[in-house]
Amino acid sequence: SANTFYYHFQDIYDLLDKWLDRKKNQFFAMTQLTGSWTDRLKVLLHAMQENPKLVYHVSDSITRERLERYVFTSIESQFYDLIGEKTAAMEITDETRKMMTSFFCCSLLGYVMKFLWVNMNVDIDASVDDLSIIFSGALEAMLRKEMGQ
């Protein structure tokens, strides 16, 4: 009944947020030991490609801003930690690390949005491999600039 629903959730968006968080946590738990970030991204995108109806129902049910915020906040800590690993032997400020994290999150967010716009009709493995090369080059350039080279 409606009373039961509103006892557990504020509105339909609250329900969707909780469902997305649950799915995200399941995904991260399942792929935690799976190789690199690119391997995890490939698993996620293939799962999305295999379930287009679900993906588009969810993405069409929320505003673009809400979807972008959800994706960004879901990957932010992952990139922050990854950049920390890549720069462990270097002296970079936390502010620089956060700036790099924001850059990579925004870039990946754009990649995911375009993936949705083209109806997920992409060679995921090749595309993510290309993205990884671009990210590696960008990180190297950022670190060279940071170190004054």
Ranges and model annotations:
Residues 6-32, 38, 42-45, 49:
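An amphipathic alpha-helix adjacent to DNA-recognition modules
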Residues 3:
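Key DNA-contact positions within bacterial/archaeal DNA-binding proteins
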Residues 106, 117-149:
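C-terminal peripheral helix-coil segments that are non-catalytic and often amphipathic
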Residues 31, 55-59, 86-89, 115-119, ...:
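Secondary-structure edge/capping motif, primarily at the C-terminal ends of alpha-helices
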Residues 18-20, 43-74, 79-86:
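Amphipathic alpha-helical segments used for helix-helix packing
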Residues 22-30, 107-118:
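Solvent-exposed, amphipathic alpha-helical segments
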Residues 64-90, 95-110, 133-136, 140:
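Amphipathic alpha-helical packing segments from all-alpha helical-bundle domains
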Residues 38-53, 102, 106, 110, ...:
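Amphipathic alpha-helical segments that line or abut small-molecule/effector binding pockets
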